[in-house]
């Protein structure tokens, strides 16, 4: 997706995550809960990647500066098994919104009924037309030397009503895509759900606000495993549940567009302080059910993997103070921890339980057991970082959004007046590669060093950016990606178990609330020339980067059991 963080610039709004590794301050509440929230330690016998040590990049100033030649990452910095690829999602690229038996999704409904909620009034009816042009997408991946394509399944394309009758034409489409990828030596990584719930289920019982969604999602996942599992070995159950819950049920700026009465959203009939947690709870329960089913019945290869893809944001304390250190810890808990802690340890972070109270649903013991250690792999979608600033916890402060519950504001500028990094063409993305390195080390040190894929990472070309007049000369994206690939290598050198980097996105597509005015693709879509795919400068760089023969690359080095 590319996280459209429309609210990250609001100082009282807190969207996403992370922080500096290596700082010893702990969350005040977590100290008292540490003994009861130890990981069950599923992640063991992991590997640390070997390769030529990378050259550290110079500090980034307030503007984009190109790396020195010796700082540009090389493929042989990474071992032969490290995977480079690109990601997309169904609604953003496929088009064909009502063709061949497909049913409407919540995003079809949202864009058609509330076009004013999209900045340019557009929709995904045609998008990049990948339903018809998927072979061109595969060709672009092959031309770049990419080894992985991460894409999502449209629930309403294969189950038009969300349940019941299967649409064989939808199954056939994904079979053709998967077979084409494999024939070109590209590995499919499948996201089962990427925000586009069938509208039929939204109309029937409110979608993810109702517990019925858990079983319906399980049946959808079962159909995916049965239809594609003979060729697909790597699965993500959900993509970016944190952003989905905050934007769809808190602020209401994404489908289905719900928020509290009196707020400015498409459907001001919800509860912005409760519904995000209700929807998130059902997502976690659906994940647990799907994973248990997969491990019991559908691990057809014996070594197939399943996990979840989390949206993440790096965090630094606003200033060097105890209170801002604690704010940073709460920021981590309320964003990364909200969905990560349950799938690792079986419950929400203690700080969330302390501050949210009865608005946060409770797991049964059986649910906790199913959730704990329910990810074989984890995806992290990283774009940017923020400073975290303490907000006084007081009975006089009444949260209006669930994102206020952390009592930590998200700032782009620190106490010294400097931005956290140079702003990109996209107003919410400030380039801060260190945030990615730090986040990966947090995963290593706090969460048992799970196998991680960077499942999204990139920036957008935007309308009106005079520094990039040529749509194919995306020099900012190239610099951004080079620095973040180097940041991944820095984390690997310090022991983080990172297995791959997937750029967001493969092609220019429909970017949710920004429509087509914000374009994240490595590949340009020329809509005036039959939606022809044209490689941008960054894509051509990947073609050279990935051209190193595999036999010249190193191999992994096994380590002992990961820390827990």
Swiss-Prot record:
Record-annotated membrane-spanning stretches: none
Annotated residues for binding of a beta-D-glucoside: 92, 194, 239-240, 383, 456, 504, 511-512, 520
MF term (GO), any: beta-glucosidase activity
EC number(s) recorded for this UniProt protein: 3.2.1.182, 3.2.1.21
Major location (coarse): plastid
More details: Wheat is a hexaploid with three different genomes that contains at least four genes coding for GLU1: GLU1A (AC Q1XIR9), GLU1B (AC Q1XH05), GLU1C (AC Q1XH04) and GLU1D (AC D5MTF8). The monomers can aggregate in diverse combinations, reflecting the several isozymes found in the native enzyme described in PubMed:10750901.
Listed name of the protein: 4-hydroxy-7-methoxy-3-oxo-3,4-dihydro-2H-1,4-benzoxazin-2-yl glucoside beta-D-glucosidase 1d, chloroplastic
Gene that specifies this protein: GLU1D
């Amino acid at each position: 997706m590319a996280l459209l963080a429309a609210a990250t610039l609001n100082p009282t709004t807190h969207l996403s995550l992370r922080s500096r590794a290596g700082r010893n301050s702990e969350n005040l509440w977590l100290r008292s809960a540490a003994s009861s929230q130890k990981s069950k330690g599923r992640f063991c016998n992991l590997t640390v990647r070997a390769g030529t040590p990378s050259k550290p990049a110079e500090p980034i100033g307030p503007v984009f500066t190109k790396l020195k030649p010796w700082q540009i990452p090389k493929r042989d910095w990474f071992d032969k098994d490290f995977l480079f690829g690109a990601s997309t999602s169904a609604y953003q690229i496929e088009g064909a919104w009502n063709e061949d038996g497909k049913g409407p999704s919540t995003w079809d409904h949202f864009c058609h009924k509330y076009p004013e909620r999209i900045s340019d009034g557009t929709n995904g009816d045609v998008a990049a037309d990948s339903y018809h042009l998927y072979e061109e997408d595969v060709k672009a991946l092959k031309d770049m030397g990419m080894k992985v394509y991460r894409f999502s399944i449209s629930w309403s394309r294969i189950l038009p009503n969300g349940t019941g009758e299967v649409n064989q034409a939808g199954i056939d489409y994904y079979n053709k895509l998967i077979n084409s990828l494999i024939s070109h030596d590209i590995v499919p990584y499948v996201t089962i759900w990427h925000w586009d719930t069938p509208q039929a289920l939204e109309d029937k019982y409110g979608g993810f606000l109702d517990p019925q969604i858990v079983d319906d999602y399980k049946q959808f996942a079962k159909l995916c495993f049965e239809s594609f599992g003979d060729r697909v070995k790597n699965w993500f159950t959900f993509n970016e549940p944190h952003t989905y819950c905050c934007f769809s049920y808190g602020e209401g700026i994404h489908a289905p567009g719900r928020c509290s009465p009196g707020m400015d959203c498409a459907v001001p009939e919800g509860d912005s302080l409760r519904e995000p947690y209700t929807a998130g709870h059902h997502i976690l329960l659906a994940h647990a059910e799907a994973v248990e089913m997969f491990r019991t019945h559908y691990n057809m290869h014996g070594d197939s993997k399943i996990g979840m893809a989390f949206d993440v944001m790096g965090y630094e304390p606003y200033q060097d103070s105890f209170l801002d250190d604690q704010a940073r810890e709460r920021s981590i808990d309320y964003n990364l921890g909200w969905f990560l802690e349950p799938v690792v340890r079986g419950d929400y972070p203690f700080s969330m339980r302390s501050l949210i109270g009865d608005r946060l649903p409770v797991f049964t013991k059986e649910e906790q057991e199913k959730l704990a250690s329910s990810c074989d792999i984890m995806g992290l979608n990283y774009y940017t970082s923020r400073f975290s600033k303490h907000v006084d916890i007081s009975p006089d402060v009444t949260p209006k959004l669930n994102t206020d519950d952390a009592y930590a504001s998200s700032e782009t500028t620190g106490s010294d007046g400097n931005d956290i990094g140079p702003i990109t063409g996209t107003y919410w993305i400030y380039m801060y590669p260190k945030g990615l390195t730090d986040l990966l080390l947090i995963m290593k040190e706090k969460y048992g060093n799970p196998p991680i894929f960077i499942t999204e990472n990139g920036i957008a070309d935007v309308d009106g950016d005079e520094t990039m007049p040529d749509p194919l000369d995306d020099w900012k994206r190239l610099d951004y990606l080079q620095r973040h690939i180097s940041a991944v290598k820095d984390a690997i050198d310090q022991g983080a178990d990172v297995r791959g980097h997937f750029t967001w996105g493969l092609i220019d597509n429909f970017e949710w609330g920004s429509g087509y005015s914000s374009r994240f693709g490595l590949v340009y879509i020329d809509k005036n020339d039959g939606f022809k795919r044209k490689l941008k400068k960054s894509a051509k760089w990947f073609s050279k980067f990935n051209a190193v023969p595999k036999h010249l690359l190193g191999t992994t080095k096994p380590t002992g059991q990961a820390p827990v």
